[in-house]
Amino acid sequence: QRQMCIRDSYNSLGYSKENGNVPGVSMTRFNLTSKTSYQINKILKIGVSIFANRRKNQNFVSDKYGYSNPVFYSRTANPYFYPYDAEHNYQYDYDILPGDEPDLKRGFNIFEERENTDNETIISSFNSIFDTELRFNDQWKLSSQVGIQWDQSSQEQYVGENTFNMRNIREDSSYDENQYIVPKGGMHTVNNATTSQITWKVQGEYKNTFNDIHDIQIMAGSEIRKNWYNTQFTAGYGYDPKTLTTKPLNIRNDKDAEKYKLHTKTYQENAFASFYTTGSYSFMSRYTIGGSVRMDGSDLFGVDKKYRYLPIYSISGMWRASNEPFIQRYKWIDNLAIRLSYGLQGNIDKTTSPFLVGSYDNVGLLPGYDKEQTIQIEGAPNSKLRWEKTASYNLGLDFSVLNQAINLSVDYYYRKGTDLIGKKLLPLENGFETMTINWASMENKGVEINLQTRNITTKKFSWYTTFNFAYNQNKVLKINTPDSQETPSLEGYPVGAIFTLKTDGIDSETGRIRVKAKNGKSMFLEDLYKVAIDEWGIGIYTPQVSTLEEREFYSYIGTSDAPYTGGFMNTFNYKSWELNLNFSYNFGAYVKTTPSYSLTKFDASRNTNRDILDRWTPENKNGKFPAILTACLLYTSPSPRDMRRS
């Protein structure tokens, strides 16, 4: 009689703590892994795997401008500002926000900010897998697997009363004279998100060899998956961390209530089902053909039944030429194979829906009346919504020689995506400006090369090299361009296309940027856009060109995605030591850089790039960079506030 025994077992427990570059920033991690398989009898094996993880991140709460980030603040702060006085009391920078005068109600001190805010995030996850395997013989095998997954993210934030962040929030809520929506005190928020999922998978496999020359492998199975996702957010104002109490908001109307939400909750549930089969046949280990068919279904496409399931499939073939007699006589050739495949893949865009989707809300329809429950429509329904599809064509070559000393792999691919989700303009009588439908299209094609070499191998020393090269070209074949879009359509261009106005240097008399029109004529921006004269001198201009005309101003210069990418890796081993030298490269991409200073909103009280020293001024008409301008496009000197701070 055969008794159940433990066949394999693996258990690990880990704990780690990392401190950030800034005091007060840290992360602790705890993880547990346990995998055990049991041999019940000759043909039955079961397994249990448990994965648990808990991560705690400690940080500070960042204000909406990002000033509490030391890296950002160090690049923008006034370099002459002292954060403490002689008695080590906080001093405040009242010029941290742009404006003509200091804001005495919104002083900023980065050390006070980091002392009186707290941001704690706890991420917990638990994943268990229960699998069963029935191996009847060397040819037949049946397996089943059940997976249960649970993930939770809990974030708790505290912003103290004595912080720039809280002062700024409260001042933004002011109205009339010294009246505020947000009460005095701090702010406490809790944001929780939970994801649960259960998966059941069953699969059967058959493989056999006939007459030592025919190899057959067949696999079929199904997978059913359901997941649940919910979030909950709560906020309290006027918070006192000692008494753990909050104060009510001074809500005047529905607009205030919408801006300062105290509680929100969302819930989402989805189900998926997949059925698949794959098979391959090989003759004399030289000629191999394979294929697969898969049916994926989702309740995201529940209106039209014919769109619920997407049949995806692939076919492939391979000729292992190195097993041919006329090549086997060349002993230095280890492997030579040519691969060819075609496949259709599907994708789900969960931001869209075939149903009329809305969110509940409580709105006061008329002044003086109680609020009524309403539904805010989020978009037009599309009963024909279906899967996005991608067709792929692949051709590959594998080549290795000299006892695997040199291994080369070359692949060419072409992929075309159809029925991609995109927005389509609708006649206004439909009640919606746009509808999300399956109609966009794009293509990708390219080459990938991988070369691995074994350069030196001895008893104590070895040197291996890996070289990767990839070229990719993509193009948008069909996309909707809204009438309000000011830049050219992406249709016919790469996804990362960059369109720019061609410049023609800096005007020597005014320091302003000149642009070059399509006819080659050099002019100012207001001439190009036919801007109406600002009669009142308050910086309000009205362009006299349509968006269609404006698109013609732009020229395509390139893409932000590098067409050529790759890497070069070297691995050196000496006894028990290993050294890795890795390099990567990207060619052919254009990078958009942010101007090193603002032409119209420059603040001399803030730290800035040295480029500004080489700007155009009446005394430096050969400056490399444009002049500082007012909203009326006139040269300006520093403001009284700037002169006071300098």
Question: Where are the model-predicted features located?
Answer:
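Low-complexity intrinsically disordered tracts that form flexible linkers/tails across taxa
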Residues: 57-75, 479-483
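Residues embedded in well-ordered regular secondary structure
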Residues: 1-3, 7-23, 61-64, 89, ...
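Acidic, glycine-rich flexible loop segments
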Residues: 1, 66-111
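Conserved small-residue
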Residues: 233-240, 437, 454-560, 600, ...
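Transmembrane beta-barrel wall of Gram-negative outer-membrane proteins
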Residues: 1-3, 7-60, 70, 125-129
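Extracytoplasmic gating/loop element in the C-terminal half of outer-membrane beta-barrel translocons
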Residues: 111, 165-167, 173-174, 586-637, ...
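Glycine-rich, aromatic-lined ligand/substrate-binding cores of catalytic
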Residues: 560-591
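Extracellular/periplasmic, surface-exposed regions of secreted and cell-surface proteins
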Residues: 29, 35-44, 49-54, 102-159, ...
